[in-house]
């Protein structure tokens, strides 16, 4: 590519065409910036602006109040002993795996684990054993199955897994497994539990100590109204000196933590998380209403012939639907499998991936009952239009 003036016109400022649409994309609903975060995005957008008053350790910066945020506010919010900021939930998971386990050790993953959990384990050169889930339509994770997976690992390898992980909720069906029971089962074998909370921390109340988990990974850009990439990593020391292991320092660069490569998310990403934090804390207190909205929405779509997969009654805003009637329509209309995406787009609704009709997932988080009613009416109109 020749970087002449004509070629460079492809870049520069690019407007986002979906920014004013009603958003039901599970990846995006929890990451929409608050107004304070939008102001912070501009104020702290310069690359290393966070380092105006840095003494060499990101999480110890006092102006702005990064130290207070990371070492006081976030531990209280997450129910953990120590917190660090990372570049995302996947980086948090990898840091734990890489620090806790040795090459060739086994990590136990739930059968609904996100691909990034698998890749993180592979990057750490670990063996993976998955806990099976029940079949359609529930996709249930049995806590006792973690014990079975651990015992099978001990039988085959001669030692317990280095770590177990639970996705809470899973990113396909929005199921919330019994994390407290699973933690208890794992601890019977002295196996620590990592909770992947990419879709929960910042949306709903999550207290790691109450659940009995050792590590918690959260996503700022997915669920804490932050610009990405940014995540959180929380560590509890009730079952071991895990903070010393995870946050060990370099012997040569004595104030730099090895697993974090020194400093992680900074400037715009961190400052948008801090700016949104007051509203994020408050919105988790409204979780009961969010669940009520999700259940109401699911019930309405099911009256039209769609089928919600996963837990019922549902306990999360992320939902997966099977839509045989929409799929049937897609087999005979001119727009084919893109008809649903185009119909929703024409009604200012964004979030269901283009080309999906038979199965799709969506999120009702902070969409509001009025907009959800409009979306329900839109589905009704679309189905009747093609009957």
Swiss-Prot record:
GO MF terms, alphabetically ordered: Sep-tRNA:Cys-tRNA synthase activity
This enzyme's EC code(s): 2.5.1.73
Ranges in a coiled coil: none
A GO biological-process term: translation
A Pfam family hit: SepSecS
Residues recorded as bearing N6-(pyridoxal phosphate)lysine in the entry: 222
The protein's required cofactors: pyridoxal 5'-phosphate
Similarity-based family: Belongs to the SepCysS family.
HAMAP family named among the record's database cross-references: Sep_Cys_tRNA_synth
Quaternary assembly: Homodimer. Interacts with SepRS.
Protein name (database record): O-phospho-L-seryl-tRNA:Cys-tRNA synthase 2
Organism: Methanococcoides burtonii (strain DSM 6242 / NBRC 107633 / OCM 468 / ACE-M)
């Amino acid at each position: 590519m020749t970087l002449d003036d004509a070629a460079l016109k492809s870049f520069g400022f690019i407007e986002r065409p979906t920014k004013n649409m009603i958003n039901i994309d599970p990846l995006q609903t929890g990451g929409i910036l608050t107004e304070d975060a939008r102001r912070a995005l501009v104020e702290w957008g310069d690359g290393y602006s966070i380092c105006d008053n840095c003494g060499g350790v990101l999480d110890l910066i006092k102006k702005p109040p990064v130290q207070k945020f990371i070492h006081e506010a976030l531990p209280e919010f997450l129910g953990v002993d120590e917190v660090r900021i990372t570049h995302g939930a996947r980086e948090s998971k990898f840091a734990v795996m890489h620090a806790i386990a040795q090459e060739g050790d086994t990590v136990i993953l739930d059968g609904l684990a996100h691909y990034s959990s698998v890749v993180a384990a592979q990057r750490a050169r670990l063996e993976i054993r998955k806990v099976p889930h029940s079949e359609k339509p529930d996709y249930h994770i049995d806590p006792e199955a973690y014990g079975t997976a651990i015992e099978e690992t001990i039988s085959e390898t001669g030692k317990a897994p280095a770590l177990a992980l639970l996705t809470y909720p899973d990113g396909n069906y929005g199921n919330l497994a019994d994390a407290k029971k699973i933690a208890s089962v794992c601890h019977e074998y002295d196996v620590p539990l990592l909770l992947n909370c990419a879709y929960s921390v910042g949306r709903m109340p999550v207290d790691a100590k109450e659940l009995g988990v050792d590590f918690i990974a959260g996503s700022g850009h997915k669920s804490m109204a932050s610009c990405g990439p940014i995540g959180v990593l929380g560590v509890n020391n009730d079952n071991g000196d895990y903070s010393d292991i995870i946050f060990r320092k370099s012997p040569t660069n004595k104030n730099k933590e090895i697993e974090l490569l020194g400093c992680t998310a900074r400037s715009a990403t961190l400052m948008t998380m801090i700016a949104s934090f007051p509203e994020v804390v408050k919105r988790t207190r409204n979780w009961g209403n969010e669940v009520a909205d999700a259940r109401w929405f699911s019930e309405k779509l099911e009256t039209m012939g769609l089928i919600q997969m996963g837990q019922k009654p549902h306990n999360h805003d992320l939902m997966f639907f099977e839509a045989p009637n929409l799929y049937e329509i897609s087999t005979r209309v001119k727009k084919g499998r893109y008809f649903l995406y185009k119909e929703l787009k024409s009604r200012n609704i964004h979030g269901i991936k283009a080309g999906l009709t038979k199965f799709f997932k969506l999120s009702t988080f902070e969409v509001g009952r009025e907009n959800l009613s409009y979306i329900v009416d839109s589905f009704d109109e679309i189905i009747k239009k093609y009957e």
